[in-house]
A protein has these predicted regions:
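A structural signal for well-ordered alpha-helices, especially hydrophobic packing surfaces
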Residues: 35, 39-42, 61-65, 87-94, ...
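Short secondary-structure subsegments characteristic of cysteine-rich extracellular domains
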Residues: 46-58, 138-157
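Non-transmembrane, amphipathic alpha-helical segments
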Residues: 16-27, 39-42, 46-49, 72-82, ...
């Protein structure tokens, strides 16, 4: 029987897959870590640091994808998709908080569609975080502009009516994004009313002092 040959051939293929996995998994972890730090830098307006970290993340993703190029069963295991999602989130967050206009596309970023859309959904949460920071500094108008961008992204996400197996469970991420947008809308509404009240009191005080 040729069992020895079969087992040897299988071991060779398994060893190759293990080697690819052991290269891709740390690369994905590096990318995710760099993206988390990049988002933190974005909220602090540390742009050089953010760009350096996002570039590091992209290099790590490319390294991981290169490692699994010949092993599609490992490529779709999930961790490289998670890394792409985090990278898309960081790049989209930068575009939203800076008011850059057009968002980067999946092609611009070199990421797959489903990770890109899930990254967009998570960027909505980062938009909320940035708006709350702006409100603490009284920058209501800028907060309104970011909320508008969040709304626009949500409408894209909710229009993606495809099975979860294709979208990486985008529906759940979209539901979370909707909740965050409504909370943020409420926070902004309160801030706007407070600003209007404060302005009215200031005008009244000036009128009284002017009499």
């Amino acid at each position: 029987m040729n069992l020895d040959q079969i087992s040897d051939d299988v071991r060779i293929r398994f060893d190759q897959r293990m080697e690819a996995r052991e290269r891709a998994l740390p690369a994905a972890r590096r990318a995710i870590r760099s993206c988390a730090n990049a988002i933190r830098a974005i909220h602090r307006s540390e742009w050089d640091q953010a760009h350096r970290l996002m570039d590091q993340a992209k290099a790590a993703i490319d390294d991981g994808l290169s490692a699994v190029r010949d092993h599609p069963e490992i490529r779709v295991a999930g961790y490289l998709q998670d890394a792409q999602k985090e990278y898309a989130e960081a790049r989209i967050t930068e575009a939203v908080v800076t008011g850059a206009g057009d968002l980067p596309t999946p092609e611009d970023l070199g990421v797959e569609d489903a990770p890109f859309l899930n990254g967009m959904a998570e960027a909505i949460g980062e938009g909320r975080r940035h708006i709350l920071d702006l409100l603490r500094h009284g920058e209501v108008d800028r907060g309104e502009a970011i909320l508008l961008a969040m709304d626009d992204m949500y409408y894209v996400l909710v229009s993606m009516d495809y099975p979860d197996a294709i979208t990486m469970n985008l529906r759940r991420s979209t539901d979370v994004a909707r909740s965050l947008i409504e909370k943020t809308r409420g926070d902004l509404s309160i801030a706007i009313v407070q600003r209007q009240l404060r302005d009215a009191l200031d005008r009244h005080a000036k009128d009284v002092l002017g009499q």
